[in-house]
Swiss-Prot record:
Gene giving rise to this polypeptide: trxA
Annotated keywords: Disulfide bond, Electron transport, Redox-active center, Transport
Protein family according to the UniProt entry: Belongs to the thioredoxin family.
Alphabetical list of Pfam families matching this protein: Thioredoxin
GO molecular function: protein-disulfide reductase activity
Known role: Participates in various redox reactions through the reversible oxidation of its active center dithiol to a disulfide and catalyzes dithiol-disulfide exchange reactions.
Record-annotated membrane-spanning stretches: none
Residue stretches making up the Thioredoxin domain: 2-106
CDD domains cross-referenced by the UniProt entry: TRX_family
PANTHER family attached to this UniProt entry: GEO12009P1 (PTHR45663:SF11)
Gene3D superfamilies noted in UniProt: Glutaredoxin
Top-rank taxon, per record: Bacteria
Protein name per the record: Thioredoxin
Cystine bridges: 29-32
Amino acid sequence: MLMLDKDTFKTEVLEGTGYVLVDYFSDGCVPCKALMPAVEELSKKYEGRVVFAKLNTTGARRLAISQKILGLPTLSLYKDGVKVDEVTKDDATIENIEAMVEEHISK
């Protein structure tokens, strides 16, 4: 999984091509940390079709706000730099994340 920061987000996500899934988390988010190993496994399953990345919002609050990240965990799917879908908070289960990815890449 690609680790993003406020300096690499624009290049990797907003100027990227294809699908990029961004896992927004923070240091104090227990549900985020619980979900991360499963998301890392998903990244292996979709390798070559979807770029999986994560961004620690603790050091990038303005960036998170600019992307309308209002709660954690949030996983946003971007296509060619545009956010096309996301799951957040209680809906951020590994099943919902995989369903979101499948729905978009199968189009």
